[in-house]
A protein has these predicted regions:
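HhH-family (HhH-GPD) DNA N-glycosylase catalytic core used in base-excision repair
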Residues: 1-190
């Protein structure tokens, strides 16, 4: 894989949806808890799959999981799990569907304890500030960091599912707590 393709981080290639996601979302700091929950749901669903697979099903996940309303998702039942096992537009994996409901409940508990999931996330960062890396090559980008290690460990202790350090790191990248746009990427020049 090339490091830079058409001025962008090479991982997004030339797929229109991937390029739009790269340019408009990935690496941009998200302070809104609803959007942070959306990324948490999508990143958890990605376990073992490619990100583009989940990105293409994003609207299906939006419909299936109540427009990413954590309170409504937290109230879902076993009947909802069965319904979602037949829902078009999402990956039909019982464990990840159930984990989304479990994670919604834990997400709400964190909001109650910390005031917001955003503040909870910042608590794992030095000086409570996002990290902007200056990598030149895709091969330099790690799969995890001390921040994702600590956050995923804490989340696991709290009962979150499908959110190990690699998925946590991807979540932190997607939501801009860790900006890994390559040094020569056009998104660095914004």
């Amino acid at each position: 894989m090339q490091d830079i393709v058409n001025g962008r981080c090479g991982w997004c290639g030339t797929d229109e949806l991937y390029v739009k996601y790269h340019d408009q979302e990935w690496g941009n700091l998200v302070t809104d808890d609803k959007t942070l929950f959306e990324f948490l749901v999508l990143e958890s669903a990605q376990a073992g799959l490619s990100w583009i697979t989940i990105l293409r099903k994003r609207e299906g996940y939006r419909k299936a999981f109540c427009d990413f309303d954590a309170e409504r998702v937290a109230q879902m039942t076993d009947e909802d799990v069965e319904r979602l096992m037949h829902f078009e537009g999402i990956v039909k994996n019982r464990l990840t569907i159930k984990s989304t409901i479990t994670n919604a409940r834990q997400f709400l508990a964190i909001q109650k304890e910390f005031g917001s999931f955003y503040d909870y996330t910042l608590s794992f960062f030095p000086d409570r500030k996002p990290i902007v890396n200056t990598f030149c090559s895709l091969s330099e980008i790690p799969a995890s960091s001390p921040e994702s290690d600590a956050m995923s460990k804490d989340m696991k202790k709290r009962g979150f599912k499908f959110f190990g350090t690699t998925i946590c790191y991807a979540h932190l990248q997607a939501s801009g707590f860790i900006n890994d746009h390559l040094k020569d990427c056009i998104c660095r020049k914004k």
